[in-house]
Amino acid sequence: MRSICFNYINRLILLVALALTAAVGQAQLLRTSYFMESAHYRMQLNPAMTPSRGYVHLPAISNIGASYMSNGIGLADLIDIVKNSDEADYFVSNAFMNRLKDNNHAIANAGTDIFAAGWWHGKSFMSLNIGVKVDGSLRAPKSLFSFMREMRGMSTIDYSNYERHIGNEELNVSAYTEIGFGYTREVNDRLSVGGRVKGLLGLGNAKLKVNKAIVKTNLEGLDPNYDWTHGDPAEVLRAKGTASIDVEADLESSIQGLNLLTNGKGYIDDLEFKVSKMGIAGAGAALDLGVAYRITGGLTLSAAVTDLGFIRWSKGSTTVAHANTSDLHFDTEDEGDLMRFADIVNNTQPLNGDLLRLRIDEQAAKARTTSLSSSIVAGVEYAVNHDKLRLGALYSHHNDPVKAQDEITFSVNLHPSSLVDVAVSYSPICCGGQSVGVALKAGPLFIGTDYIYTGKNTKCCNALFGLSIPLGKASKSN
């Protein structure tokens, strides 16, 4: 019988999936907006890139979006993995396997503003924001899904000398509230510098890392194409020999109100979440810094680093667990022993809780510190026709626990009037040269994407929709 243990891991995967696909897209993901003069969303990328006018966000209908990016796992594939059932068979598809890379990762950085406003005061621009952000990422090597196919009997296996390594999996999710104050100063007609100081209130953080997972068998008399999920158990009982599972994995969770429950053997097999006890699990701070310099009348260089910060999670909200597979050695001389092995390897979940056997380590629980996923951008733009046409190129680097992302975005921006700003972009790296973006700012309305949706199994897609009220008059320098 499948252990309930996996339910906890599956919920963590679901939480990451929500971070990747829920309606949250934060402006820092929308590179297409970077050279749009009237779009205040670009300040999330560089606090020195001020909008032409102040603004007030409309609560609940501003900064609504979604974002997903992966090098190998398509959006539809991710949904199949997350909603995985006992009879899941997505991994038996050759098309699915052909889409995968040797090392697959999926990354998202998302958030929404509860309140945000910005305004000009002379040559200074100031802003306030209160928002919620979620960072999520996962890593899953192709060997993991190859192992699942082997256990379905899709490969000819010599079980008398079988060894499969399926480690190097990782899952991260972090949610926090951000309270920020930004200040930008036009030092002169050429130079602008800006910064944003942010206080962070941690809502929750979880990290699961599988360093190694090794499955070995020395079994005689077993069909080389035996299906451990649907095969006849009598065939397993006729086999002779030994098998073993060796895992190194760690789980760190800092969420107020979450209790991990264990079975009689001390392994996590369920969770209890009390909404009444949900609260602040940690606190921290972060800093954004940016600069923009106009070299000539039309040529401007800019650069920024954002989300330089940390969150310190409290000891009282933290639970630590480690894999304990010391007793996962099986011998057909012991009655029913090999059936225990079968119950583990026939699990069709990509992160198999029966295999990990996570045991809470109360002595290891302590306050812990995590870093934010910081970003670096550097841009160059050339404006002509009284700034009504802008040509831009933006380099961006985003740090993430599972994979750093680099991208170059080329854009053409049209600004025919103070009410309308349009941009079209092309980003050649992350999505194999198939990423065209577009953004529109028309009065209070903003809508944009870096990756126009190309189908249900796209590997890169995002969208951002927002409504804001213009505040004050346009800066004289814009």
Language-model regions, residue ranges each:
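Subset of outer-membrane beta-barrel
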Residues: 28-478
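Bacterial Sec-dependent N-terminal signal peptides
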Residues: 1-31, 380
